Curated annotation (Swiss-Prot):
Catalytic activity: a 4-hydroxy-3-methoxy-5-(all-trans-polyprenyl)benzoate + H(+) = a 2-methoxy-6-(all-trans-polyprenyl)phenol + CO2
Residues binding Zn(2+): H182, D183, H186, E198
Lineage of producing organism: Eukaryota, Metazoa, Chordata, Craniata, Vertebrata
Transit peptide, start-end: 1-15
Gene Ontology cellular-component terms listed: extrinsic component of mitochondrial inner membrane
Protein name: Ubiquinone biosynthesis protein COQ4 homolog, mitochondrial
Compartments, record wording: Mitochondrion inner membrane
Biological process (GO), any one: ubiquinone biosynthetic process
Subunit structure: Component of a multi-subunit COQ enzyme complex, composed of at least coq3, coq4, coq5, coq6, coq7 and coq9.
Pfam families referenced in this protein's UniProt entry, alphabetically: Coq4
Entry's EC annotation: 4.1.1.130
The keyword Metal-binding appears for this protein: yes
GO MF annotations in UniProt: 4-hydroxy-3-methoxy-5-polyprenylbenzoate decarboxylase activity
């Protein structure tokens, strides 16, 4: 066992279980290997990864079953200890979500819009979106409200980490797409990025996707809420669960082509129920 742990500690996969660097701020993981380990080591690691013949896509880190098991266990413990370790949440989703990702991929293949997304592989990044145009859209449009969500919560789509541990190129894209539409779900559900908002979104996503990471977050996230927020959660969770069951697969919507659509209209098309009113 000690030999195995030494091997894993030296492997690229084990790097993700190191403590977060001081660059983590505002509830989103903002660190990278260059900040933690030095630019030279990052360049060497990236070059070695690209030269690995078993890599299936640019950020792929191949892992065997034992490595995946240890990564899953380690990331689960760290994610439960600190839910704002979004790097650990990401690793947990990738190492435990193979079955759910295949089901999501199959749903996308059966839907014309979902199939188009799989074929065209759009990305939601600062480099692919014109945020100034989104900010200038009329109030109530999906694009305007998404831009407002990002501005109010001081986040950007680039804070979403690239997929690394999914051993299938198409499933890796499905995982990346889920990750990049997460903030769009916040916008459509009207939820902020605080712990209450994240738990509500996780309940919706758990029902929608079946990803173990979402189920874990939905189940254990409430443990960090105070009594006042638990009362609000008692109203919001049934709505989130019902909306998740009622909604079509949220990955089957080409959101980049719907910025001008009203939030109310898009919610209705997807099947998301109107959010309940919560007393302050």
């Amino acid at each position: 066992m000690s030999g195995l742990l030494r091997y894993l500690h030296c492997s690229p996969a084990w790097r993700v279980l190191r403590p977060a660097a001081p660059g983590m701020q505002g509830g989103r993981f903002r660190s990278n290997y260059a900040a933690e380990e030095g630019i030279e080591e990052e360049i060497q690691f990236a070059a070695a990864r690209q030269e690995d013949p078993s890599s299936l896509y640019s950020d792929h880190i191949p892992t065997n079953a034992v490595q995946k098991l240890l990564l899953s266990a380690g990331s689960a413990v760290m994610a439960l200890y600190d839910p704002y370790r979004h790097d650990m949440v990401a690793v947990l989703g990738e190492t435990t979500g193979a079955v759910a990702l295949r089901k999501l991929r199959d749903q996308m293949r059966r839907d014309p819009e979902g199939l188009q997304i799989l074929q065209e592989r759009p990305r939601i990044r600062m480099s692919t979106l014109d945020f100034q145009t989104l900010r200038e859209m009329p109030d109530g449009t999906f694009g305007r409200e998404y831009a407002r969500f990002l501005d109010v919560n001081h986040v950007t789509p680039d804070t979403r980490m690239p997929v690394k541990f999914v051993d299938d190129e198409e499933l890796a894209y499905v995982a990346q797409r889920y990750r990049e539409v997460h903030d769009l779900m916040h916008t459509l559900l009207g939820m902020p990025t605080n712990m209450l908002g994240e738990v509500v979104v996780k309940w919706f996503e758990a029902v929608q996707t079946g990803l173990p990471m979402c189920i874990l977050g939905a189940a254990f996230g409430p443990l960090r809420l105070n009594n006042k927020r638990m009362k609000k959660l008692g109203v919001l969770v049934p709505w989130a669960v019902q909306s998740g069951r009622n909604a079509r697969c949220v990955l089957n919507f080409y959101y980049e082509k719907r910025w001008g659509q009203s939030v109310a209209s898009l919610r209705e098309e997807i099947g998301i129920l109107p959010p309940p009113e919560i007393k302050a």
